[in-house]
Amino acid sequence: MSAPGSRAGGPGSRGSGPGSRASGPGSRASGPGPLALLHTSPLHVPVFEALRDEAHQGLELRHLVVEELLARARSEGPEAVADDVRAVLDRAVADGARAVLCTCSTIGAVAERAAAGVPVLRVDRPMAAAAVAAGPRVVVLAAVHSTLEPTVALVEEEALRAGRRVDVRTVLVDGAWSFFEAGDTDGYARAVAVAADAVTDADAIVLAQASMAPAQHLTTTPTPVLSSPRPGLAAGADVVCAS
């Protein structure tokens, strides 16, 4: 059954309760899918729609926005929302999703571990693999503290998978999240870019949250700055096309 306040995209799949949003018009296309995307902010929906239109035309996306999952995970820890995440995934599968892409790094590990019956992917895993390939010195930037530990663990997991040594440092971008919560996405991106440009002695800079992706194009550092939406959606598209 669906989690409280969750709502799946697509006709007839609307859930009950406040605090969530379903995919809007234009999320359906004639082609592979559907790929369900689990978001914790409605601001992610147009980002992934644009990436789909640019690189994966014909891929059907269904957006599930459950904002309370991040709020609770930040205050109580990601494991506190494991049951609700699983309920949202079960609803997505019942509504026909062939795979689910979790776009929230804080709850990504919880989502990935759920036995949902279809592939469940973390949007940040391809980014973490790219960071490991870039070199051993990886700096993880996040705007919320709850994202740091899961992202560090993911980078270390990808390093182990690749048989590489990695030294991960973290930077919490103080004050940036308040811009995002206020709807000032430009101010948010600028704050993240400034923090990225201040990083030294790194082979790769990881923007831990999908919401940070616009900052990637504002940085001036010669160090590779990696974000998750584009490679994450590509991984999801590959899975549904192969299924």
Residue positions per predicted region:
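Non-catalytic structural scaffold of enzyme domains
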Residues: 1-10, 14-243
